[in-house]
């Protein structure tokens, strides 16, 4: 597992105040996604972890779409900081 790939964009004081904010939740989901991805590189046949990864990806995608509708500027900044592709609109 690679521990250096985890992100700490938000300072420690902001973490204590804003645990429920959308940006903090997206950040924590991204860390969980990267942790599970590195696990699945070693254990390719761990199908329960693959299912969990898909669930987390869907949850992050819904939160990103919510953020893009409500605060487009913060959405763009967060995508650039986390190095995530922009979602396709349907």
UniProtKB/Swiss-Prot annotation:
The keyword Metal-binding appears for this protein: no
> Where can this protein be found?
Plastid, Chloroplast
Keyword Kinase annotated: no
Q: Which SUPFAM superfamilies match?
A: S15/NS1 RNA-binding domain (SSF47060)
Which PROSITE patterns does this chain map to? Answer: RIBOSOMAL_S15 (PS00362)
Q: Which Gene3D superfamilies match?
A: S15/NS1, RNA-binding
UniProt GO cellular component terms: chloroplast; ribonucleoprotein complex; ribosome
Q: Name one GO biological process term.
A: translation
Write down what this protein is called: Small ribosomal subunit protein uS15c
* Natural source organism: Morus indica
């Amino acid at each position: 597992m690679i521990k250096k790939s985890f992100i700490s964009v938000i300072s420690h004081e902001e973490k204590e105040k804003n645990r429920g904010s959308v940006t903090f939740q997206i950040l924590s989901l991204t860390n969980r996604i990267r942790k599970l991805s590195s696990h699945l590189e070693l254990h390719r046949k761990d199908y329960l972890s693959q299912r969990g990864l898909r669930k987390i990806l869907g949850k992050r995608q819904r939160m990103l779409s919510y953020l893009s509708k409500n605060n487009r500027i913060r959405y763009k900044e967060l995508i650039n900081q986390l190095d995530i592709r922009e979602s396709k609109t349907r």
